[in-house]
Amino acid sequence: MKHQQNPVRGRLNAWLFRILDSYMDGKYGVLKRRLFAELPDTVVEIGAGSGANCRYLRRGTRLVAIEPNVHMHPHLRAAAARHQLALELRPLGADPLPLADASAEVVICTLVLCTVFDPVAVLREVRRVLRPGGRFICIEHVAARAGLVAWVQRLLHRPWHWFFEGCHTDRATERLLGEAGFRQVTCEAITVPTAFVPIRTHIAAVCTR
């Protein structure tokens, strides 16, 4: 995951996302529980962060967590232990993914493709590591088509991009998923009523290799 890593912002974001954990669960929890309801025993997560998704995985799940921000790692380890997951932490990025070809049944990520340096390359890596029939499940904030949110996204893009280590408020992720070569892509448009206006427009996607 090639993003603009900065030790100060990395530490600050690790602290912030830990503080916002309950808030994010309130905003995304129902959706995540639905999408992650029937995951296999081993799950690969890109951008596992501070472990916000650990609560949605079954106890005993083997979680292969890709997370380059070392300041997130203590929170991630604590969350995995709290929810009784077998954590395998890979402190690397997603391009390339540190996994063998056709080795994963499921890859998940939430609010990550907005931040990666080259989402096309990351999606290519996801397809590479998925087995035939394997699924990529993601929730991402995306560019609004028009209106107030689109205007706010354009207005705040530069400071948001700087503070959140490369996050794009207006990335056309749905289009990128459709062009990534998956056999099937199912996208659901969602509006999340969050106080963070630039990221209210979302998609939830299931992509099958």
What function would you assign to each model-found segment?
Residues 95-107:
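A short acidic, Gly/Pro-enriched loop at the edge of an enzyme's catalytic core
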Residues 19-42, 52-56:
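Conserved alpha-helix/loop element of class I SAM-dependent methyltransferases that forms part
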Residues 105-118:
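A short SAM/SAH-binding and catalytic strip from SAM-dependent methyltransferases
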Residues 202-209:
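C-terminal lobe and adjacent flexible extensions of AdoMet/dcAdoMet transferase-like proteins
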Residues 44, 49-96:
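Class I SAM-dependent methyltransferase SAM/SAH-binding core
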Residues 120-132:
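A short glycine-rich, Lys/Arg-flanked "PGG" loop and its adjoining helix->strand segment in the class I
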Residues 1-15, 29:
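N-terminal, positively charged/glycine-rich alpha-helical extensions of SAM-dependent methyltransferases
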